[in-house]
Swiss-Prot record:
Residues 126-140 have a biased composition (Basic and acidic residues). It is found in: Virion. Residues 148-163 have a biased composition (Low complexity). Residues 174-185 have a biased composition (Acidic residues). This is Uncharacterized protein L399. Its main location: virion. One of its GO terms (cellular component) is virion component. Keywords: Virion. Residues 126-211 are annotated as: Disordered.
Amino acid sequence: MDLGSEFSDTGNFSGFKNNDLYGGDKSSNTFERNFHNIFEEAKKYRQRIYDAERKMNGGADDNNSLKPKRQINKPLRLMLDISKILRDSGNYKDLKTGDYMGIAKLISDRAKEKVGTTEISDEVRSEALKMARDPDEFVTKYRSKKQSSSSSSSNSRGNSRGNSRNRSRRNNDWDDSDDSDDSDNWDQRGGNNDGDNIKTDVWNDPQQTSNFTGGCGCGMKGGNNWDNMRVFNDTKNLSNNNSTNTLNNNNTIISNLNNATNTLNNNNTTTSNLNNSTIISGLNNATNTSNLNNAVSTLDNNNTNISNFNNATNTRNNNNATNNLNRNTYAFNNGNKLNNTAWSNFRKSTIY
């Protein structure tokens, strides 16, 4: 496979010219910039294709034009060639690439030692390739060395873990004693890891249970043995629990007292407001009634006065009208010169 014909070293695709694209504006040509990025990615894939082809060919040199320019050093080249010989033999299918390279290193070192040089010369290369065709000695040596190294590494990890994990500090001295039996003694003494302060056997034992009487843990029997000491400690924990319960009860009582106080205050307030409302309402009613009565009385008096005034006015007007009528009649009679008898009769008829 040869991709070199489509791409040139200058980064331009052979089918185009920069000046032929959109009037030759290279700085603002978006298409050209995108094409350049694609070309860079293509070069990376070209190298990967070459590496894959070379690996398929067993690493042998060829005249492929896509071959990278950097050269593999001679020691690495020799080790790769030896590894290919070992792999192609098919006798060591359990080995991996790293194992082949390790065996190739042993063969290369032996060849340099035999020739008496530290450089990879043609003579060393020839001797190493000859040894690679009969590698049983080197394969056995490599496997033995690898197994020994693996065992040593495992022991080192175990010692490191033991030194850092199983040692404890007591009274400023390091205690290297074996603590393997501590867990058994710990379980037997009731200090299990479940977080229980009192074991089941303590509750079931009447003698041990009697030690809890009084809630203070002071009723131990039989001296300072471990079981009694454990019961004492457990009793202290039980007392603490009782104290906690008592505190909770006190909180409940305080809460209830607050509720009762609030209820009492509410009742007093309601009663007071009711009485005040009643008194104010009564006062208002009384005031309104008094004002109304006064208004009625005033109205009656005013009406009476007005009526009397009107009557007086009417009477006065009537009197004035009568006087005027008398004067007019007198004048009329004088004008007509009524006789005394007619005048007398007329006056009688007009005077009320």
